[in-house]
């Protein structure tokens, strides 16, 4: 299958959390079983250091909400995977990836740019895999603005992956103008534009990071007010447990740990790494006491 993997961040080029890691290891795994996978992500300021290895693929205007801006697509092959970077200096080349007052506008631009890139590059995926709130408006825009344009748009299926339901992309209603439409039940939630709700309502299929989390987010306690929308899509909503990239996180080659080890030397290696962590955090060096390390 042709898969276009859309992510607001992608390791090793940009990262604030686990989404970037998933954008690294999942496409590699899909390619290993003979799928054609392309990753598309914003060209952030920190990505400029890789620019010399890129080639320009296309440039075109993007129009939305009375705004017209130019985006440039750059391509790079990294570890056998094709990456496309969406460059717009105004929206993306900033110090941080997120957290700006115009985030709705920024990721509206990203959404339109990707949908327009399909025409520019003549690459129409069978599966458009979108992730978290930043890409949540894709299914709505695809349905309302693009499917009617040609058979290739019409036949695209969308998979929406929820990594953290708490961050929904909720904005004032004035941002609806960026989607060239009147208010629509798809994306309005408690009188606000909600990117994640739009994806839950419109995506062909929905998944999240584990079967347990899938069940949790359909409860009022952990659903962050979207449990009702998820229950309505329950038959299309699955939990698939995230794994790790065993090449990237290989203790035999990992340069980020003090002592590497393998299945023959793991007892000594883990003990030495435990000792190093205790020293690093100025804790009592008692190797007989359990040490619990949590990253989250």
Residue ranges and their predicted role:
Residues 1-296:
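Catalytic cores of nucleotide-sugar-dependent glycosyltransferases that transfer UDP/GDP/TDP-activated
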């Amino acid at each position: 299958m042709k898969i276009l993997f859309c992510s607001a961040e992608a390791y090793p080029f940009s990262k604030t959390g686990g989404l970037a890691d998933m954008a690294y290891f999942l496409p590699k795994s899909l390619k290993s079983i003979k799928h054609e996978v392309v990753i598309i992500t914003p060209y952030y300021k920190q990505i400029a250091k890789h620019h010399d290895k890129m080639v320009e693929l296309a440039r075109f205007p993007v129009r939305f909400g009375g705004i017209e801006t130019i985006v440039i697509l750059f391509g790079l092959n990294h570890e056998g995977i094709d990456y496309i970077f969406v460059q717009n200096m105004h929206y993306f080349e900033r110090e941080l990836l997120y957290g700006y007052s115009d985030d709705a506008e920024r990721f509206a631009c990203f959404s339109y740019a990707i949908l327009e890139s399909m025409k520019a590059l003549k690459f129409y995926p069978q599966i458009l895999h979108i992730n978290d709130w930043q890409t949540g408006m894709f299914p709505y825009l695809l349905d309302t603005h693009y499917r009617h344009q040609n058979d290739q748009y019409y036949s695209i299926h969308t998979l929406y992956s929820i990594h953290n339901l708490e961050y929904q992309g909720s904005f004032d209603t004035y941002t609806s103008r960026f989607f060239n439409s009147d208010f629509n039940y798809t994306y309005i939630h408690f009188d606000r534009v909600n990117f994640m709700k739009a994806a839950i309502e419109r995506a062909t299929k929905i998944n999240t990071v584990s079967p347990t989390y899938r069940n949790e987010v359909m409860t009022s306690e952990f659903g962050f007010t979207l449990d009702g929308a998820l229950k309505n899509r329950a038959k299309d909503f699955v939990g698939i447990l995230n794994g790790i990239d065993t090449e990237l996180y290989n203790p035999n080659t990992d340069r980020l740990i003090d002592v590497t080890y393998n299945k023959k030397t793991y007892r000594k290696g883990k003990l030495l790494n435990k000792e190093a962590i205790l020293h690093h955090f100025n804790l009592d060096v008692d190797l007989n006491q359990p040490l619990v390390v949590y990253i989250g």
